[in-house]
Design a protein with these regions (language model features):
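N-terminal helix-turn-helix DNA-binding core of bacterial DNA-binding proteins
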Residues: 27-67, 81, 152-154
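Charged, amphipathic alpha-helical coiled-coil/dimerization segments
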Residues: 26, 77-140
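Residues within helix-turn-helix
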Residues: 57-58, 69, 76, 96
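Short helix-coil-helix linker/hinge
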Residues: 36-42, 70, 101, 126-128
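N-terminal leader segment of winged-helix/HTH proteins
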Residues: 1-36, 163-200
Length: 200
């Protein structure tokens, strides 16, 4: 069988790009959130609790795509930093939930708009159609990766339950995460925060 060198180069280039984009994205996010004394991991945990309320560590691990052990260590560090607290259920002491402290709330609230501004800045280079196509393509790649980790997973069900099929994702974010009036200011052209992309 003849090897299609051009196609194999494309496959290799795409795989390298996926890895490098992921690594660079985390570096950029760390730079954005470091101004608020947070890491990307801490920001993700705090925004999840802010959006959904107190959660069990196992639920946080599932939502943030982490192992139970790594989630436990992250929570330990954030408890020591005073950002979150663990609370045992009074009726069932085996059940523990993680909630945000006042310090955590104070720290994360200004970081959320900064993160949203960063997302818009990075993706502004793509047209609306390109953004939709990229999202659909990445969903397919994610589905294959999940299937690799769990051969018993139903890929059709994974795609059906993906974020891209949630029509209220943006509305929930505006309601639960962004400060009142922020989106009106942003869409009117009043940017919040300074650019970080140009410095990387």
């Amino acid at each position: 069988m003849t090897v299609n060198v051009e196609q194999e180069n494309t496959v290799l280039r795409l795989w390298l790009l996926l890895r490098r984009v992921g690594d660079t994205l985390v570096r950029c996010q760390d730079l954005v959130f470091s101004k608020y004394g947070l890491t990307t991991e801490q920001w993700g945990l705090l925004t999840t609790i802010k959006s959904r309320g107190p959660l069990r560590p196992s639920d946080l691990a599932d939502l943030l795509n982490r192992t139970p052990n790594s989630m436990s260590m992250l929570i330990d560090r954030m408890v020591k930093a005073g950002l979150v607290r663990r609370t045992r259920n009074r009726k069932d002491r085996r059940v523990v939930t993680v909630s945000m402290t006042e310090k955590g709330k104070t720290v994360v609230e200004p970081a959320i708009p900064a993160g949203w501004e960063f997302i818009h800045e990075v993706l502004s280079t793509l047209s609306d159609d390109e953004q939709r196509d990229l999202a659909d393509t990445l969903e397919k790649v994610k589905c294959e990766l999940v299937g690799y980790l769990d051969p018993e997973a139903d890929k059709v069900e994974i795609l059906k339950n993906s974020l891209s099929n949630d029509p209220d994702l943006y509305k929930r974010m505006v309601k639960n995460l962004l400060p009142p009036g922020y989106e009106a200011k942003r869409t009117a052209g009043k940017r919040v925060g300074k650019s970080v992309v140009g410095r990387l």
